[in-house]
Amino acid sequence: MYLAIEGVIGVGKTTLARMLQPAFEAGLLLEVFEENPFLSNFYGDRARYAFQTQMFFLLSRYYQQRRGVKEHMDAGRSLISDYTFEKHALFARVNLTGDELEMYNRIHEALCEKTVHPDLIVYLRTDAEVLMHRIAMRDRPYERQMER
């Protein structure tokens, strides 16, 4: 079984994935943000850094999915992830326009065909105030410039 947990930033995806892992005796595939060299600049100037940020996430998640999901599925093990590969296309539609969005969509479509889709997606929600409080509490440097 491949279970993915989705929702907006700060909603508790990683926390829930870690809580469920022992109960399902599953592997854990967590989204890695810290390695994106464009992310903190993106939060400061979305228009300028959107394409680089989105492309980095797209390729990074693709390689993570190809390795992590395939490894667990081939071994017959369950897997819990705190993101879906498809999610980044939603962010691209919000942050990109014109030729950049067209380029992103073409690459995403080609890569998406090669990824394994979750058997179940759990979507988490909470109030904006709760989200902003959680984001402030974890104090990640690249999230400090986020707008509500």
Model region roles, listed by residue range:
Residues 1-2:
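Pre-Walker A (Motif I) flank of P-loop NTPase domains
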Residues 5:
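Hydrophobic anchor at the beta1->P-loop junction of P-loop NTPases
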Residues 8:
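P-loop (Walker A) phosphate-binding loop of NTP-binding proteins
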Residues 13:
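Conserved lysine of the Walker
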Residues 18-60:
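Conserved substrate/cofactor phosphate-moiety recognition/catalytic segment
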Residues 54-55, 68-93, 132:
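Flexible phosphate-sensing "switch/lid" loops adjacent to ATP/NTP-binding sites
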Residues 60-79, 109-113:
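Short amphipathic alpha-helices and their capping/turn segments at secondary-structure boundaries
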Residues 88-148:
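A glycine- and Lys/Arg-enriched "phosphate-lid" helix/loop adjacent to the NTP-binding pocket
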